[in-house]
Amino acid sequence: TLKGEVPDLTNCEVLGPNNNLKFEGNVSVESNVLFDLRKGPVLISDGAEIQSNTRIDGPAYIGEKTQIRSAQIRSGTSIGHHCKIGGEVECSIISSYSNKAHDGFLGHSYVGEWVNIGAGTSNSDLKNTYGAIKMNVGNVEVNTASNKIGCFISDYVKTSIGCFIYTGKRIGVASHIHGYVTEDVPSFTIHAKSLTGKSFELHKNSAIETQKRIMKRRNRNQTSYEKDLLNQVFEMTQDERYIAGVLKTDFSM
């Protein structure tokens, strides 16, 4: 059971049973926030900040010290701790220390830790035909039997501004994506095919240095374990990049 001080909701609106709104610790809720509890509970953890003009539809979870920036949080969304979230998020899991601070749509998707989703990035979670979405899993095409599947974004991924990700696409660890993403992206790849026709390998030393920088911004010290893990993933995914035709040259536009 979550127990905490209930913030002042005088200038907010609550739809549905009040006991479906739970606060843990001290939560900041600004004016003009709407909580829709008719489909399920909304749970908000200690230190979270809900800014004005936000709508949160239950069931939903907002993690510790996460900031919701005038966003639309739709049903079925779970957001980890120390995240910054804006735009629209629907039926998605966003892991801790990941940012989607700007406008853009994220739906029926999974986002790993330490991800940064650039301004205007959006994903598709529905085909134009409304048919079942097919995915490539282990070089085998799989019919998911679902018409609502977004994208799967691994740890440490960075998306550029104005990036568009098609249905059912997987983005590998530490990759950078630009423009339109119409195919799966291997780990440690700078994917810019819609802009340059090419994808380039992201050197593991660059990924490790970026890891160090982003952790420092969150007052975290990079550990030898975390560096070693990136090293190992880089080695384990070399065949993926080779099969995908990723170039071992410096990225250029």
Identify what each model region corresponds to:
Residues Y61, Q67-R69:
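Membrane-embedded translocation segments of transport machinery
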Residues L34-L37, R55-D57, I73-R74, S122-N123, ...:
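Glycine-rich beta-solenoid repeat tracts in large extracellular/virion proteins
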Residues S70-A71, H82-L247:
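Glycine-rich hexapeptide-repeat left-handed beta-helix
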